[in-house]
Structure formats: structure tokens, C-alpha cells
Design a protein with these regions (language model features):
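Structured, solvent-exposed acidic/aromatic patches
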Residues: 2-204
Length: 204
């Protein structure tokens, strides 16, 4: 979720404030969004996107409850719970830094979150669900850095700690820009984010 956060760099933070960038994220697009609506769809406030993400994940949890995926590049219930853990951790961290944002969220949604501690508790609960459901375990420090082989650790989707990952084959890479990273990594200098396409400007 793209959202400007305070950096501590006075010039950047002041410019963000002057442009009213604090607290707004990305436009919300649903299956029902029409082309006309999409052309006039401003960036949504953080609380609306938090609500949208949580509702979407709750729906995914229900729809995937009996699904058995064939490969790790497809989502499943533990993946949904992992995303829920990340979402609640993001919210808890936000409300810890900016307590006033909790009131803003509760005044504009029906989430009724009691405190930052509630968020951290939820994050821990969902993280534990991921471990229990998937059998995945966090990497040790040695494993994180590749252990005795730099082809393991987080370098391979086959590692047990990976719950969800991209499995790239030669069939997925058609050119230097027509590939997953070329579309999804706007900060890089190849793909749609390069100087020619200037895709990086689309997230500003």
C-alpha cells in the first residue's frame, strides 16, 4: 500500500504536508468499478483502505477454506492468514506512532479497534495460525543468510519458511520489461518504471 510516511527529512516532510499527502494511500478498485468511475477515482484515506483490505481478506479466507493448492505460487488459507498478520501489524505500528489515527479510523469505519495492543495481539494470533496450518517455521539466523549454501535460505521458494512465492520460468519472462518484476517493481530502472515508460511517476 503506497502511502507517504514521515521520513525525518524536513524538506520532504514539509512538501508532503503542503500537498496534503499524509493519510492518503491509493485508489480503491473493485470488480464493480466502472471505467467512468475509474477515471475519477482519487486516492483513498488510510482507514478506507485498511477496511477494504480486511474485508477482502475475510472474503478470501472463506472462499479458500477448502482449497488445496498444487504449488506455492498460488494462495491458500495460510497465505491469507499471513497477510492478515501483516495487516494487523501495520495497523498496530501505525497507532503506536500516531495514536490520533486510531480515533480517525474508528470514527470513519465500523472496525471498532480498541487499541494498538489489540492489533498486535491479532497479528500474533494470525502469525501463529500460519505456522500451525502450513508447518512453515521462521528461518534461523544461519538459514536466513544461506547457511552452508547460498542457494537455500530465502533464495529458494522450496525453503520450508516460504509460505507463498513467485515461481518464475522461461515462459514467464518474455522480454526485459514484459515480466513480473517489470510490472510490479516500480522503483527499478527496467520494465515499466524506466525512463522511457516513466511508470514510476504513476505512484506519486
Amino acid at each position: 500500500m503506497y502511502e507517504y510516511k514521515k521520513t525525518g527529512v524536513e524538506k520532504l516532510d514539509a512538501e508532503a504536508a503542503s500537498k496534503n499527502l499524509y493519510g492518503i494511500t491509493v485508489p480503491i478498485i473493485t470488480a464493480e468499478t466502472t471505467e467512468e468511475e475509474g477515471r475519477n477515482n482519487p486516492r483513498a484515506p488510510f482507514y478506507a483502505v485498511y477496511k477494504f483490505i480486511l474485508d477482502d481478506l475475510a472474503s478470501a479466507e472463506e472462499l479458500l477454506s477448502d482449497y488445496q493448492r498444487p504449488t506455492k505460487n498460488l494462495p491458500c488459507t495460510p497465505v491469507v492468514h499471513g497477510l492478515m498478520a501483516r495487516m494487523w501489524l501495520e495497523m498496530g505500528s501505525r497507532f503506536e506512532l500516531y495514536p490520533e489515527d486510531l480515533n480517525t479510523l474508528n470514527n470513519n469505519t465500523d472496525l471498532n479497534i480498541a487499541s494498538k495492543e489489540t492489533c498486535f495481539t491479532k497479528a500474533a494470533e494470525y502469525a501463529r495460525k500460519v505456522i500451525n496450518e502450513s508447518g512453515a517455521m521462521p528461518l534461523t539466523e544461519k538459514e536466513w543468510f544461506g547457511g552452508d549454501s547460498y542457494t537455500t535460505g530465502f533464495n529458494s521458494v522450496l525453503t520450508n519458511s516460504w509460505v507463498w512465492g513467485s515461481i518464475m520460468t522461461t515462459e514467464d519472462v518474455h522480454s526485459y520489461w514484459l515480466n513480473f518484476a517489470g510490472s510490479m517493481c516500480p522503483e527499478q530502472t527496467f520494465g515499466y518504471g524506466n525512463r522511457k515508460w516513466q511508470g514510476y511517476k504513476l505512484i506519486g
